[in-house]
Curated annotation (Swiss-Prot):
GO biological process: one example: defense response to bacterium
Lineage of the organism: Eukaryota, Viridiplantae, Streptophyta, Embryophyta, Tracheophyta
PTM info: This is a cyclic peptide.
SUPFAM superfamilies: Cyclotides (SSF57038)
Disulfide bond sites: C5-C21, C9-C23, C14-C28
Keywords: Antibiotic, Antimicrobial, Disulfide bond, Knottin, Plant defense
Protein name: Circulin-B
Amino acid sequence: GVIPCGESCVFIPCISTLLGCSCKNKVCYRN
């Protein structure tokens, strides 16, 4: 929840969910 994964999730979901990232406030975060 704190580390930005450098990916947005405004129109498409996070591809980086495979790396443990999740969508928050239209940006993908890890932890």
